[in-house]
Amino acid sequence: MLKLQKKLKNDYGLVFNDEDLLKTAFTHSSFTNEERLPKIANNERLEFLGDVALSLVISDYLYRTYPEKLEGELSKMRSSIVRTESLANFSRSCGFGEFLRLGHGEEKMGGRDRETTLENLFEAFLGALFIDQGMDEVRKFIQHVVIPHVKNDDYVKVIDYKTELQEVLQIGGETTISYKILKEEGPAHDRSFVAAVFNNGKELGRGLGKSKKVAEQKAAENAIKGQNHVS
């Protein structure tokens, strides 16, 4: 962790007070499984927290920066920014993958550069930063790493199928869209998810993905295309 601490200080001016917290953020579930450590020792809880912090900061930035855009447009922009591919790229740009503690099996299967793993790592780091130093530092970090790409429009042109589906269905009148994870398969370090999207209780489509977010996006895409099957 000393090399990581040095990198964070040199690149972002960050010095973690709680090194164990930082270590947890960079601990994959495959590592804790192989080492027979408690599940709470991996980064999944921090990922949950970081996901919320990231969404809040991005939402606040978009709201203040684009006063002319409607809610639907802002939602579409935010979804494009926080999607799996985008967050994985942010994680790569920070060089985080090098410091991730992985199990040997996951390492051999290329887990260190798997997009969902890097996405989760980026969110876990934000969660750890929030606990260690508060929301202001999280905001500063996101402004340094993420916001420049938003200003360059790098991540706001990607199709967000969930928002697109909502817009299509709303044309036909009142609608209640919901998503449900139908199935989880595979070991903890290499999960696959099957999601379904419903409108007013009627299933419209299913999707398969390596994360719940990806599976839901795929379900929405299949619903738009009229494909009521897993793909």
UniProtKB/Swiss-Prot annotation:
What's an example GO BP annotation here? mRNA processing
Question: Which top EC class is given?
Answer: hydrolase
Reactions catalysed, as given in the entry: Endonucleolytic cleavage to 5'-phosphomonoester
Entry annotation: catalytic residues: D51, E123
Top-rank taxon, per record: Bacteria
Would you tell me the Gene Ontology cellular component terms? cytoplasm
Residue numbers binding Mg(2+):
E47, N120, E123
Question: Which residues are connected by disulfide bridges in this protein?
Answer: none
For the RNase III domain, which residue ranges apply? 5-134
Keyword Chaperone assigned: no
EC number from the UniProt entry = 3.1.26.3
Cited SUPFAM superfamilies: dsRNA-binding domain-like, RNase III domain-like
Which Pfam families does the record cross-reference, listed alphabetically?
dsrm (PF00035), Ribonucleas_3_3 (PF14622)
Alphabetically, the GO molecular function entries are: double-stranded RNA binding; metal ion binding; ribonuclease III activity; rRNA binding
The answer to keyword Nuclease applying to this record is yes
Compartment(s): Cytoplasm
Which key words tag this protein in UniProt?
Answer: Cytoplasm, Endonuclease, Hydrolase, Magnesium, Metal-binding, mRNA processing, Nuclease, RNA-binding, rRNA processing, rRNA-binding, tRNA processing
Give start and end of each DRBM domain. 160-229
What InterPro entries does this protein map onto?
Answer: dsRBD_dom, RNase_III, RNase_III_dom, RNase_III_sf
NCBIfam families according to UniProt: RNaseIII (TIGR02191)
Its family?
Belongs to the ribonuclease III family.
Give a short account of what the protein does: Digests double-stranded RNA. Involved in the processing of primary rRNA transcript to yield the immediate precursors to the large and small rRNAs (23S and 16S). Processes some mRNAs, and tRNAs when they are encoded in the rRNA operon. Processes pre-crRNA and tracrRNA of type II CRISPR loci if present in the organism.
What name does UniProt use for this protein? Ribonuclease 3
